[in-house]
Amino acid sequence: MKHIGYGLGVLGAGYLAYRLLNNGFSFAAKYPRLYALVTKGESKTYNDYNFYSGATIKGNIDGKGSVYPLLKRPLSTYTVGQVKKMQAQSRSNPGQLWATGRFQIIPTTLIMLQRAAKISDNAIYGKVTQDRLINAIIPIYPNLNNYLTGKVADTDANLKAAALDVAKIWSSVGMPSNNKSYWGKKGERATTNTLDVQKVLKSYR
């Protein structure tokens, strides 16, 4: 029993070290350094969300803010199917669950990524599932996917093309040309600098 306990302790310490190096993401996350950077301007936990109540959008970040009426427990304990059902609600009473989880996945994107990642409606919408879902968005953007997987040369042009794809995915990320949000209003500066994104992308080469 002493040897088993020691082995479990080593495994536990190893897993903790892995989680720290992996920026709190699960083992399923392919690009944790990139995910950690881009989610800084999006969310804090896998349970974060926002929702529409009529024409008003309300948010709950890190357990603080408005509570979506249909959520009776943490978001990450529901199944993918249950999350989709809440995202399909009318924006009138009780309101429509909108952007969900660590990556703030909206309804149409969840359906698309679920199909791409081949995830069941019965899967729990926890860390592993959310990380698998976001992995599935990378191949949809060829410049980003080709750069991260080494299918193109590590040139400045290819790096900037990959960084632009990141800005297209996450509205809080700046474009390489002007560090402004791809999806924001004219002249709106992003909260995540494109140079930081490019540095992280380059670290995967």
Give residue ranges: language-model regions.
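Single-pass alpha-helical membrane anchors
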Residues: M1-N23
